[in-house]
UniProtKB/Swiss-Prot annotation:
Binding site for ATP: A9, Y10, S11, G12, G13, L14, D15, T16, S17, G117
SUPFAM superfamilies: Adenine nucleotide alpha hydrolases-like, Argininosuccinate synthetase, C-terminal domain
Native source organism of the sequence: Chlorobium phaeobacteroides (strain DSM 266 / SMG 266 / 2430)
Subunit structure: Homotetramer.
Underlying gene: argG
UniProt protein name: Argininosuccinate synthase
Length: 400
């Protein structure tokens, strides 16, 4: 009788490395380790040999970067999705795609179970398991970190040494870090005190604003229907554009975010993020929308932006609601074509200009010069009708 197979999300870190051995023994199963490339800079070249040496029977490496940018990041950007008006959702966006890759591998390999290495206290367990349930409800889900016997990192290292599991964890960084091309999340250590300023060693890619260049950097970003397509006049792929903006923004100290956020599981947490490209692109995209969207659409879309951000953050990417909102968002983005010029300087963003063939700004109507074509006399009748309801109310209720 053949053994059952378990597909696991594998990063090569301490937790997922010992998870292979632990699951293999507990369930007498074969382990299929799956790693997705979402643009993280972390070493990924030797993961296959490490997974096999740890006890996996198979390994799948999936380059998800193009799909991540085109089907996840750009959707979130067009939606204006910033969780609680700050977080550009880098980790939250990556989880459903990674979970989808694990499901695909599990189905291809004939697995009967899925496993992840998330703790029982965070958001990611929700994102993985809700996605698993959405895409493969017939597969059993395992969460070893919620049930295994290890109560400390030291205990995990001891287990690894006992079973000759190759891990490099000998000195722990004080921070927990997750990274993909859209941003980096940093937590734990001294960051758990919300009154402690983040030490410089917490930041992974951004230059301290104080040490950033004394001369500003100016970038021109061109959008077509809400999607960035060129940088400084050079057409490039979404992946290349994000990588370049990450580099340029980081060098200028742009993209450092510090927030107290409300987790899915009901607690508040202090999070530090680095997201240079995301910060710049959200800023530029919003300014282009101000120029091209009709007033009521622009104002109403802000509500949709928050709803969309909540859907992503709460792990509901594959929900009918997200698909329904996409239809509205795609309609709003049809006129969002044009160029935005942004100045980057010592951690700050400044808008220098914007232009669009679909601009709703009419200089002849807006000007106060002799070129003015606005009918000033029409304002009297408009104001009379606009305030008529309140005038009538006050006449009936004089005491108010």
């Amino acid at each position: 009788m053949s053994k059952e197979k378990i597909a696991i999300a594998y990063s090569g870190g301490l937790d997922t490395s010992i998870m292979i051995k632990w699951l293999k023994d507990k369930y007498d199963a074969e382990i299929v380790a799956v790693t997705g490339n979402l643009g993280q800079q972390k070493e990924i070249e030797n993961l296959e040999s490490k997974a096999i040496a740890t006890g996996a029977s198979a390994f799948q490496f999936v380059d998800l970067r193009k799909e991540f940018v085109e089907e996840y990041i750009w959707k979130a950007l067009k939606a204006g999705a910033l969780y609680e008006d700050v977080y550009p959702l880098a980790t939250a966006l990556g989880r459903p795609l990674l979970a989808k890759a694990i499901v695909d591998a599990a189905l291809a390999e004939g697995c009967t179970m899925l496993a992840h290495g998330c703790t029982g206290k965070g958001n990611d367990q929700v994102r993985f398991e809700v996605t698993f349930a959405s895409l493969a409800p017939h597969l059993k889900v395992l969460a070893p970190l919620r049930e295994w016997e290890f109560t400390s990192r030291e205990a995990e290292i001891a287990y690894a040494l006992e079973h000759n599991i190759p891990v490099s964890a000998t000195k722990k960084s004080p921070y927990s870090i997750d990274e993909n091309i859209w941003g980096i999340s940093i937590e734990c250590g001294v960051l758990e005190d919300p009154m402690v300023a983040p030490p410089e060693d917490a930041y992974q890619i951004t230059t301290s604003p104080e040490n950033a260049p004394d001369r500003p950097t100016v970038v021109d970003i061109e959008f077509v229907q809400g999607v960035p397509v060129s940088l400084d006049g050079k057409t490039m792929s979404g992946l290349e554009l994000i990588m370049k903006l990450n580099e340029t923004g980081a060098a200028n100290g742009v993209g450092r975010l510090d927030m107290i956020e409300n987790r899915v599981v009901g607690i508040k947490s202090r999070e530090i993020y680095e997201a240079p490209a995301a910060t710049i692109l959200h800023f530029a995209h919003r300014e282009l929308e101000r120029l091209t969207l009709e007033k009521t659409v622009f104002q109403y879309k802000k509500n949709i932006s928050q709803d969309y951000a909540n859907i992503i953050y709460n792990g509901l990417w594959f929900s009918p609601m997200r698909h329904a909102l996409d239809a509205f968002i795609e309609e709003t983005q049809k006129p969002v074509t044009g160029l935005v010029r942004v100045k980057l300087y010592k951690g700050s963003l400044s808008l220098l200009g914007r232009t669009s063939p679909n601009s709703l700004y009419n200089e002849e109507l807006a000007t106060y010069t002799e070129a003015d074509t606005f009918n000033h006399k029409a304002a009297a009748g408009f104001i009379h009708l606009y305030g008529l309801g309140l005038k009538t109310f006050s006449e009936v209720n004089p005491a108010r």
